[in-house]
Amino acid sequence: ITGIDYDEEINTVVVRTKLKTNYEEKLKKKTLTSGCAQGTIFGDIMEEFEKIKLSKTAKIKASWLIKLLKEINTTPSLYLKARAIHGCVLCKKDKAQVYMEDVGRHNAVDKIAGYMYKKSIKPNDKIFYTTGRLTSEMIIKTVKMRIPILISRNGFTSWGVELAKKSNLTLIGR
């Protein structure tokens, strides 16, 4: 560390180091996302995403989908009570395995990712359900988790669909 500065006016701490960064290179590859907040992702995330191709052999039966949706929509949850939070469910075939909820849809997705990582769960035969819209960010997160099927009770953005096609992710939504 070569220096630390605090700017009270904008409530920011700046830490300087001798380490080199590729920040300027990342800024050149900046991409606006299709989520509600018009977030920003940087090129290295997209470069990593574009290398991932999910298996085209992932299948979901209509009977599994009907059973899953019935189970998810009748299992007691904060989402069903309040409707003011987001829920995500990790499924295998026609069975829900793990429910996670949060006020932020990204956080609910991240909880599933963390759970899978901690429990060393293999994603290739899993189905991912979310109450949130299927924006580009949700597609990227699901693909990075290597889950081949993503379901939502909501719709998707055009860029989300485009990214899903590029990675072989199966989308099911309104």
Task: Identify the role of each PLM range.
Residues T57, H86-V89, K93, R133, ...:
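Short, surface-exposed, charged/polar-biased interaction segments
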Residues T75-I121, I127:
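Histidine/lysine/aspartate-rich catalytic loop segments that bind and position anionic ligands
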Residues R105-R174:
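Feature captures the catalytic cores and cofactor-binding loops of soluble hydro-lyases/lyases
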Residues I1-G87, K92, V98:
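Intrinsically disordered, low-complexity regions enriched in acidic/Ser/Thr/Pro/Gln residues
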Residues R16-L19, G39, L68, K93, ...:
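Fold-independent oxyanion-binding glycine-rich loops
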